[in-house]
Swiss-Prot record:
This is Small ribosomal subunit protein uS14c. One of its GO terms (cellular component) is small ribosomal subunit. It comes from Aethionema grandiflorum. Keywords: Chloroplast, Plastid, Ribonucleoprotein, Ribosomal protein, RNA-binding, rRNA-binding. Its main location: plastid.
Amino acid sequence: MAKKSLIYREKKRQKLEEKYHLIRRSSKKEISQIPSLSEKWKIHGKLQSPPRNSAPTRLHRRCFSTGRPRANYRDFGLSGHILREMVHACLLPGATRSSW
């Protein structure tokens, strides 16, 4: 189980990313449309003004059961070992059992 503080930190990053998503997207669109370099630098400065944690690259997928940040399956939202346990317990319909 991951520490609660790490899980809350990740949730805070998700909220920040949602808040600043439109600002980032609009300024990136402006940069691609403007031909002059000096104006691009000004818009680039605006792009750097939101907090670092609002960048989408700082987000990690976490297992919703344990909070583990590694070995996550996107389709299920689970880490590998929890996914295996749930498949063996027949809790995931349509998943076939396998041992590795």
